[in-house]
């Protein structure tokens, strides 16, 4: 289980009828590959005109207990992929200055795309400048169309990056989302030193326990960070390597849900099971519901069915403390193994939540630290939420699961 998935999963969405007011759908998974694309995980991704941009992450699979997160196994290329033709373009990060290059080959960074800009925060990796493994105190703004043109056409790379240094962004394993021009940097931790079994006291680690908000302004072609703030919750936000997904809540308000994640304070290898709803006005833990089947960052996609006022979030594989057997009985494994489970968490019209596993499974124990790339032309609502009601009847290619640890 220390390799990386080099195939791409084609995720197909089947839309049958509705039953008893609850929208039903099924899934099918197939595989494809892009020649020359390395196995990636824990990377950043963006899209433009049907093509994909990948930056950072790892190519060595699950980190080992010793000599983890070495530079030699970092993704040191910028990749542009055309999923329709299978064409791949790559350019080395070595063409960039040290301080920029080092952050860009980090892992577990936070990222979100705003129009043509990829906002890339933090990340963990080896810094030759600092002579240590660090969480990068940087926010980097990336011109996606310009960079993709440079990668595919041989132009200069550096003009398409702007880096801002600020310890506010020294976070790894968190999540970054955007709502109404405000960025939400949620959860995660800061880790300084070598991540290994014998790190001992030679490390510094602390969880942010926070929702950090900020805005960006462009002045004279340069980006400025404005209006920083933070809300700290040492219980409910003490999580990393989790899933944060855009949501439409029962009353129609948009926001996010922080799902599961690791680790509960004071408990060894105990994931969070309760989600947290995040709105502009604040955050509230979901009471009376546990998410059992996806406890770690994995490929995911949010789907809203307006006719039923139901918000579905689909999760693909990853790591989980629980799994379903052939009889749909819930089994527990405190070692938190990799799983093949495909599951959904649904917010129903009355505001309650339910979780269910699909009959289909992933063909490998993968999905952890993978990314879901929507197929071009899929109808979406705010923040990339799939518009279920606008999808045609029958089977539909919804998107692709790229990378992940096997």
Question: What are the roles of these predicted feature ranges?
Answer:
Residues 101-108, 125-179:
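Asp-box/WD-like beta-propeller blade repeats and closely related beta-sheet repeat scaffolds
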Residues 41-45, 102-111, 172-176, 240-245, ...:
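Beta-propeller and closely related beta-sheet repeat lectin domains
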Residues 23-34, 43-95, 123, 127-138, ...:
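Beta-propeller domains
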Residues 293-392:
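Loop/turn-rich, solvent-exposed surfaces of beta-rich toroidal or solenoidal domains
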Residues 68-87, 132-150, 198-220, 270-283, ...:
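Beta-propeller blade signature
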Residues 51-55, 117-121, 182-185, 252-258, ...:
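Entry beta-strands of beta-propeller and related beta-repeat scaffolds
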Residues 23-33, 86-100, 145-167, 214-235, ...:
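Blade-edge beta-strand/turn elements of extracellular beta-propeller
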Residues 58-60, 124-126, 189-191, 262-264, ...:
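Residue-level signature of beta-propeller blades and closely related beta-rich strand-turn architectures
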């Amino acid at each position: 289980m220390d390799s990386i998935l080099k195939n791409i999963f084609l995720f197909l969405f089947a839309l049958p009828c509705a039953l008893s007011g609850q929208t039903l759908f099924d899934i099918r998974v197939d595989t494809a590959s892009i020649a020359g694309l390395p196995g990636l995980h824990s990377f950043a991704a963006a899209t433009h005109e049907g093509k994909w941009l990948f930056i950072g992450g790892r190519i060595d699979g699950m980190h080992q207990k010793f000599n983890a997160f070495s530079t030699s196994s970092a993704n040191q290329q910028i990749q542009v992929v055309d999923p329709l033709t299978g064409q791949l373009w790559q350019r080395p990060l070595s063409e960039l200055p040290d301080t920029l290059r080092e952050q860009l080959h980090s892992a577990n960074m936070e990222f979100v795309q705003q129009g043509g800009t990829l906002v890339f925060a933090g990340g963990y990796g080896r810094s030759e400048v600092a002579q240590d493994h660090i969480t990068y105190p940087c926010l980097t703004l990336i011109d996606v169309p310009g960079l993709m043109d440079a990668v595919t056409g041989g132009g200069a790379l550096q003009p398409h990056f702007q880096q801002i240094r600020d310890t506010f962004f020294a976070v790894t394993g968190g999540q970054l989302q955007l709502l109404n021009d405000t960025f939400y940097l949620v959860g995660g931790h800061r880790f300084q030193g070598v991540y290994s079994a014998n790190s001992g006291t030679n490390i510094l680690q602390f969880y942010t326990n926070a929702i950090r908000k900020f805005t960006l302004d462009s002045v004279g072609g340069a980006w400025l960070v404005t209006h920083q703030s933070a809300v700290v919750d040492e219980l409910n936000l003490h999580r990393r390597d989790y899933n944060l997904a855009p949501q439409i809540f029962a009353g129609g308000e948009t926001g996010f849900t922080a799902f599961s994640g690791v680790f509960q304070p004071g408990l060894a290898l105990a994931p969070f099971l309760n989600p947290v709803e995040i709105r502009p006005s604040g955050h509230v833990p979901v009471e009376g519901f546990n998410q059992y089947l996806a406890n770690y960052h994995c490929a995911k996609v949010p789907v809203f069915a307006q006719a039923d006022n139901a918000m579905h979030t689909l999760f693909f594989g990853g790591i989980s403390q629980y799994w379903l057997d052939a009889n749909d009985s819930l089994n527990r494994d405190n070692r938190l193994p990799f799983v093949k489970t495909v599951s959904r968490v649904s917010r129903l019209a009355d505001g309650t939540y339910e979780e269910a596993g699909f009959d289909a499974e992933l063909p490998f124990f993968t999905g952890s630290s993978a990314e879901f790339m929507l197929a071009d032309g899929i109808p979406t609502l705010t923040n990339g939420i799939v518009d279920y009601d606008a999808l045609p009847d029958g089977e539909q290619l919804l998107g692709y699961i790229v990378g992940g640890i096997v």
